[in-house]
């Protein structure tokens, strides 16, 4: 009887361990890169490519005061949330991709923009916002007025996120050492790094070494893709198994989000590119985890 009890207990522990392994890393894709920015069809497409979730965008920004955001409308709030839930598609994060082109330093309404994003996150159950700094130029990368202004605005936005139990992940384009310095200046628990493999690969930096330098607690989420060339399964610029082993040792867990890594010969084939990349990441980070 005792032996049977121990056998059952051991089997339960194996199942629990397997469940944890499946959930340690989850895989999503960016709606705007799949040509589904704030379109209801993004959830069905996410299901079709086999992803666990989708990173929704806030909508275009341009010269607008606020994002072109459908989810300020109660009708779309209910419709989008119901559709995502009914298909079992999670929304781990919401992107402010408008700041790839717009300069945050020159925006006086940064708090309003942050609140718009945080409200949308709350509706969709997301905990992480993506904020790229690509549109803010390069002057802020060195000491001076531009950096001081950016740091203050990011601090303000971070505190709004912190108060709601959320995080804004910034994409800096800098190496780990410089990024850590920037985070210390911002000094807000609501601001972390949204790590992008593409930046380090393009700069010739070692992805695994940069991840280790950043450390588990500074990384909110990861864009696990590179500059368009080939899909991840054929790209020699990143050793994804080594990346997984690095993250395992760091004790990091969370969402890996496909942004690019499109085959330039089939750049418009959304299902092929994102489906291939999602399957590859799942093979490495989920199926591989179950075999350990």
Spans of features found by a protein language model:
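Sec/Tat signal peptide C-region and signal peptidase I cleavage site
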Residues: 17-21
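Bacterial N-terminal signal peptides that target proteins for export
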Residues: 1-7
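Glycine-rich, proline-tolerant flexible connector loops at the mouths of alpha/beta enzymes
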Residues: 57-81, 133-141
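Bacterial N-terminal signal peptides
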Residues: 7-16
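Conserved beta-strand positions in the central sheet of alpha/beta enzyme cores
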Residues: 55, 93-95, 130, 169, ...
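Active-site acidic/histidine proton-transfer and metal-coordination neighborhood
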Residues: 85-87, 100-193
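Charged helix-capping and loop-helix junction motifs
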Residues: 70-77, 108-115, 143-154, 206-212, ...
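Histidine-acidic metal/acid-base catalytic patches
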Residues: 22-27, 35-52, 176-191, 195-292
